[in-house]
Amino acid sequence: MSKREAFNDTFLKAARGEKTNHVPVWYMRQAGRSQPEYRKLKEKYGLVEITHQPELCAYVTRLPVEQYGVDAAILYKDIMTPLPYIGVDVEIKNGIGPVIDQPVRSAADIEKLGELNPEQDVPYVLETIRLLVNEQLNVPLIGFSGAPFTLASYMIEGGPSKNYNKTKAFMHSMPQAWKMLMDKLADMIIVYAKAQINAGAKAIQIFDSWVGALNREDYRQFIKPVMDRIFRELSAEQVPLIMFGVGASHLAGDWHDLPLDVVGLDWRLGIDDARKQGITKTVQGNLDPSLLLAPWEVIEKKAKAILDQGMKTDGFIFNLGHGVFPDVNPETLKKLTAFVHEYSAAKKTEQSS
């Protein structure tokens, strides 16, 4: 990507609720996944090897910008990246996901956890960001982190879970230890995100993949206070802050209360319905990624409906309701990106005339 190309700040403007010439679009898990170049790379390197080599990681991160024409890049990393450096023995296993050999079972386990020093512990993350921002991208780079609940659920369950029984039992039966764990993880997330911003990330998205397992009462009691602290500390960095979780539409109003800029929605809550619930901040979403496997006519119809709802305010970013599946045709994402740009640009021109 040539440095001489004009910087495309459409995503940043929309995140702040400002007027744009078209609706910005990017896709969760746009980096890697379905791209043939990425698959070829994965034949030789594993996830950890790619993420630890800045040149390779930068290549994977910028591929969708070059191929799809999206308005933002998101760093190619895993939410588990910082955990080993605070003392969590985690391994990413093919076909399973993150596996932790010694799950958290007590306050004593939490007390053993250390602190993250990003420049010392994850220099490869920061070098990747600097490489992208200084030399390769003409769009904003989104940094990210996992959220305390999701990270804690892996640490307590020992890996992926369908019901998070152990996590919820721990939360309710040992509330003081739970708060200690939330605070430890929040400290890590804050310094990790700030380091990404200092290296050049222009926005931060916090992924709470599994928080939809909680009801609103539990979220407000056990999670919301620590999320408020995280976003309050990060807001001083003056970059857009985004919140997203899967199956967590019932928590969208609580996210809106937090000191953040963008509320990410999955496909379960329509944008009009979110607005009726009082969400006035920028909304990001929310095409069901499953539809990317459907014929183009189906995708176009649904994308148009989402755009018509989202464009009722300036604060709208088009995205999926979750990540890109590996079997999605890259040409579909390229076509969808062009459609979002063209349809929204024409509609905005019409609205202003």
Curated annotation (Swiss-Prot):
Its main location: cytoplasm. It catalyses: uroporphyrinogen III + 4 H(+) = coproporphyrinogen III + 4 CO2. GO terms for biological process: protoporphyrinogen IX biosynthetic process. Its EC number is 4.1.1.37. Keywords: Cytoplasm, Decarboxylase, Lyase, Porphyrin biosynthesis. It is found in: Cytoplasm. The keyword Cytoplasm applies. The record marks D78 as: Transition state stabilizer. One of its GO terms (molecular function) is uroporphyrinogen decarboxylase activity. Belongs to the uroporphyrinogen decarboxylase family. Homodimer. NCBIfam families: hemE. This is Uroporphyrinogen decarboxylase. It comes from Bacillus velezensis (strain DSM 23117 / BGSC 10A6 / LMG 26770 / FZB42).
